[in-house]
């Protein structure tokens, strides 16, 4: 499957409703501050410019700190040596967001007679969080687990990475890939059993296609301004740009926030949101991982909430958009990957990628025995 030389078209197996697309052409030209985003436009002109900038930078810095992992993880599989069971706060959180492994029987009981669709984040979910984003390699046993899941259920990778890059990590042609936080979606090869009958060509949907020149331009600007900050890296993910500060000294985080904010002053159609030790510069359109999940479900003909159980597993703030969609639809389960208590829209939790793999293997065994 060639993931690099496709044109931005939709070849839909089912009719895609205008309500789902949300009038994308008008949104592409519209500017508005999105929830969870920070922007330099639309402020009260009577307020001091410097004061506005300071408020923006401090708000972004607070978000950076709140999204930072509080424990040093073992790069082997995201494990650490502390005991969550001894932490009262963690125990209280687990009561609200219980283990998906311990609750597996309950999850599959609700799926009896229904179709399951599986959605997976990549970094921190299928691969460990590592200092160098280019080395977030998926293990062979995890790849085998995902491949087996895709044999029985429609399966998609929904990542902030570019679609091409996440495919290079996963290397499975039988999956759907939604890169750039769902702004770059491609179906698997047409011969795969979960591909729709009408999908004789590659399904490609890119709601932010018009932003490509702007993303390239802002990438160059960001590379230039953070080049003097030790540990800061910039990653062009095609329809969004990631500014990684995982390896930046905490004393320099405010400088990173300030420089990113200053760059975005020249790009009012872009916004910045925070992820796990990363700032994400994205187009200001009404599209996110939640919208991508809805689009994929409809494209697959799995939009019937009465007969479909979507399962979404992810570890980042951007995955909350997908968790929220599943809650609002009152259908399916969001599963947060975390070793620390977090505010979340997810129903269940898993500690790390090793537990994610165990859960995926559980799903496969359950399906084999239920056939």
From Swiss-Prot:
Recorded GO MF terms: trehalose-phosphatase activity
Hydrolase among keywords: yes
KW Transmembrane (keyword) present: no
Known pathway: Glycan biosynthesis; trehalose biosynthesis
GO BP terms in the entry: response to cold; response to salt stress; trehalose biosynthetic process
pH dependence: Optimum pH is 6.5-7.0.
Disulfide bridges in this chain: none
Enzyme Commission designation: 3.1.3.12
Tissue expression as described in the entry: Expressed in roots and shoots.
Reaction equations catalysed: alpha,alpha-trehalose 6-phosphate + H2O = alpha,alpha-trehalose + phosphate
Pfam families: Trehalose_PPase
Cofactor requirement: a divalent metal cation
Induction / repression: By cold, drought, salt stress and abscisic acid (ABA).
Keyword annotations of the record: Hydrolase, Stress response
Function field: Removes the phosphate from trehalose 6-phosphate to produce free trehalose. Trehalose accumulation in plant improves abiotic stress tolerance.
Extra information: Over-expression of TPP1 increases trehalose levels and enhances tolerance to salt and cold stresses.
Entry's family note: Belongs to the trehalose phosphatase family.
Name of the protein this chain belongs to: Probable trehalose-phosphate phosphatase 1
Species assigned in the record: Oryza sativa subsp. japonica
Native organism taxonomy: Eukaryota, Viridiplantae, Streptophyta, Embryophyta, Tracheophyta
